[in-house]
């Protein structure tokens, strides 16, 4: 039960921090007023802080064996003040506090990036040493930031294409899709390269034996889901996006908007599945034994 709760907390925290950064970043190159809502960013930052506290308590309980708050408190202090994980946690809480106090898009993007990057200290990179530790953390952080930019853009587009779409809103959607093209290409490249690097850091240049354990099975599902996401992203980029642009000229935008909505919703669902798998994978060893 504790392991399941840990995975659920990790999933919720990952989703929250990915979106704090991703939505704020998307809002910088989009004119969607929803993404400029300060209560939205504040609420997500507060949620992230609460999830971070819950995650720290759960981790400390598992490591110390204590269940009563009075007995657990010294261990919590030691965790925060004397470990790298605790330092990353404190940095995350500070960054989230900045989002609450200054929820503008630029402050939220920068602070959200710091909060999201702190999750790297909860992954497999924390077990490395020396230069290997540095490069593993760098790869993890870039992977997280690219994933956050992607997830935030997907949710933003889903929100934009939901509900009744008039001519003005359609132009905003088409403009947002156009602006996301170059960002999306950079995101896909970063996620792909750092994903391969992270596999090499964790498992090494081998496949034998890895796929026969839970870790390997989940990783295979993750790679398959990512491949389908790439297909959908290519469909959006080379077919549905241009189709939406053409619909602005001929006035027949309903079919194009619905097709884009279906594709983006499917892509978002796959992204959520991947985050759930990542939350689970972070608790497992790649060794099938």
Name these PLM-found stretches.
Residues 1-289:
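Polytopic transmembrane helical bundles with strong interfacial aromatic enrichment
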């Amino acid at each position: 039960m504790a392991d399941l709760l840990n995975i659920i907390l990790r999933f919720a925290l990952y989703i929250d921090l990915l979106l704090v950064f991703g939505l704020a970043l998307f809002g910088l190159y989009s004119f969607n007023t929803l993404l400029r809502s300060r209560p939205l960013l504040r609420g997500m930052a507060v949620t992230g802080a609460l999830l971070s506290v819950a995650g720290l308590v759960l981790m400390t309980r598992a490591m110390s064996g204590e269940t009563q708050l009075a007995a657990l408190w010294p261990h919590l202090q030691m965790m925060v003040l004397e470990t790298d994980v605790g330092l990353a946690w404190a940095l995350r809480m500070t960054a989230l506090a900045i989002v609450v106090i200054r929820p503008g898009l630029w402050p939220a993007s920068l602070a959200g990036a710091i909060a999201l990057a702190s999750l790297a200290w909860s992954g497999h990179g924390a077990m490395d040493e020396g230069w290997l530790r540095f490069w593993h953390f760098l790869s993890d952080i870039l992977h997280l930031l690219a994933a956050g930019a992607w997830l935030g853009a997907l949710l933003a587009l889903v929100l934009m294409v939901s509900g009744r779409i008039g001519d003005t809103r359609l132009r905003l959607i088409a403009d947002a899709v156009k602006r996301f093209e170059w960002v999306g290409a950079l995101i896909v490249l970063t996620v792909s390269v750092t994903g391969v690097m992270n596999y090499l850091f964790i498992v090494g240049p081998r496949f034998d034996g890895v796929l026969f354990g839970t870790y390997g099975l989940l990783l295979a599902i993750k790679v398959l889901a990512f491949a389908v996401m790439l297909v959908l992203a290519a469909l959006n980029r080379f077919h549905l996006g241009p189709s939406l642009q053409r619909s602005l000229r001929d006035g027949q935008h309903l079919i194009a908007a619905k097709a884009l909505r279906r594709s983006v919703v499917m892509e978002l669902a796959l992204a959520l599945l991947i985050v759930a798998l990542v939350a689970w994978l972070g608790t497992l060893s790649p060794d099938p034994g």
